[in-house]
């Protein structure tokens, strides 16, 4: 039975953690995750998704939430646990060489590396209109997502939002980690092709700001930034549900309401047309498109804003 230290934080990581802890070939000896965070208006201290799952279902397994992995005591703790593998998935901390040298460190990255190294591989793939994505296992080294590839699985992501793709890739990753660890000695690591490498940065709230220039680009932003940070106009109006109707139409005025439907409306961009199904003004409740227009006394050929 191989001893595993798992390092991960969000629900994507929990799916992988669950697969490992339930498999009879592995013994989870510790979880490392981010410290509890103050969440919401009341700033309630909340554990990470992985910590909540493990403490509720496997309370005897130790959980560590260090602020730094460079602490000599933390490195000693990991060494004393004597893991066969350290598995990392969306942990949010960089592993120092002192830890990388203790055992094979296998990272599960939510892209087909070397494409989309960094913090937002799923959102970046959607923004770039990729129809395929995937997950890969990688031998970690000191660079950011630069290690040799062990195995990978790919899937179709066309017209899926980030939340849906996260779930899809988490389930793939849960299968992939079992395959990689069980066949580790038979796998020949494959060096990444540096000339094909791309980087992606962390998503910020302001990335959700949109204009009505291009319907296709707005639609891709909507998919990429669901559930967070969402998409919103400069006046704070959020588009919560929308569909791409036409990406080429150009003979209407930007922002013009083209047609009212039962629970939605068609909106003209400078290029293309969107169906707005649900939207929300800042500080107010969400409304379906038709109800929102009725409340504002807006009709066909009026400007939305």
Curated annotation (Swiss-Prot):
Any one of the GO CC terms: cytosol
EC number: 2.1.2.9
Signal peptide: none
Matches recorded under InterPro entries: Fmt (IPR005794), Formyl_trans_C (IPR005793), Formyl_transf_N (IPR002376), Formyl_transf_N_sf (IPR036477), Formyl_transferase-like_C_sf (IPR011034), GART_AS (IPR001555), Met-tRNA-FMT_C (IPR044135), Met-tRNA-FMT_N (IPR041711)
Residues annotated to bind (6S)-5,6,7,8-tetrahydrofolate: 111-114
Pfam families for the chain: Formyl_trans_C, Formyl_trans_N
Keywords recorded for this protein, A-Z: Protein biosynthesis, Transferase
Reaction catalysis annotation: L-methionyl-tRNA(fMet) + (6R)-10-formyltetrahydrofolate = N-formyl-L-methionyl-tRNA(fMet) + (6S)-5,6,7,8-tetrahydrofolate + H(+)
GO MF term list: methionyl-tRNA formyltransferase activity
Function text: Attaches a formyl group to the free amino group of methionyl-tRNA(fMet). The formyl group appears to play a dual role in the initiator identity of N-formylmethionyl-tRNA by promoting its recognition by IF2 and preventing the misappropriation of this tRNA by the elongation apparatus.
Protein family membership: Belongs to the Fmt family.
Name by which UniProt lists this protein: Methionyl-tRNA formyltransferase
Natural source organism: Campylobacter jejuni (strain RM1221)
Name of the gene encoding the protein in the UniProt record: fmt
């Amino acid at each position: 039975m191989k001893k595993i230290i798992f390092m991960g934080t969000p629900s994507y990581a929990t799916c992988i953690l669950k697969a490992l802890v339930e498999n009879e070939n592995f013994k989870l000896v510790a979880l490392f995750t981010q410290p509890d965070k103050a969440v919401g208006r009341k700033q309630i201290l909340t554990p990470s998704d992985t910590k909540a799952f493990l403490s509720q279902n496997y309370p005897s397994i130790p959980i560590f939430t260090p602020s730094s992995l460079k602490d000599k005591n933390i490195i000693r703790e990991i060494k004393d646990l004597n893991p066969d593998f350290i598995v990392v998935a969306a942990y949010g901390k960089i592993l120092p060489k002192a830890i990388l040298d203790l055992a094979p460190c296998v990272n599960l990255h939510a892209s087909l590396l070397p494409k989309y190294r960094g913090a937002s591989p799923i959102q970046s793939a959607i923004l770039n209109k990729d129809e395929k994505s995937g997950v890969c296992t990688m031998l970690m080294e000191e660079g950011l997502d630069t290690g040799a590839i062990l195995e990978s699985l790919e899937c179709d992501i066309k017209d899926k939002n980030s939340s849906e793709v996260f779930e899809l890739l988490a389930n793939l990753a849960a299968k992939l980690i079992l395959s990689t660890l069980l066949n580790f000695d038979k796998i020949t690591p494959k060096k990444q092709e540096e000339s094909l490498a791309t980087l992606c940065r962390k998503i910020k709230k302001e990335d959700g700001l949109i204009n009505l220039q291009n319907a296709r680009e707005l639609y891709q932003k909507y998919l990429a930034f669901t559930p967070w940070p969402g998409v919103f106009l400069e006046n704070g109006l959020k588009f919560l549900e929308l569909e791409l109707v036409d990406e080429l139409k150009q003979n209407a005025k930007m922002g013009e309401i083209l047609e009212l439907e039962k629970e939605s409306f068609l909106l003209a961009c400078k290029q293309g047309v969107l169906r707005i199904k649900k939207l929300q003004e800042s500080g107010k409740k969400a409304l379906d498109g038709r109800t929102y227009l009725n409340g504002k006394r807006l009709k066909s050929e009026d400007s939305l804003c």
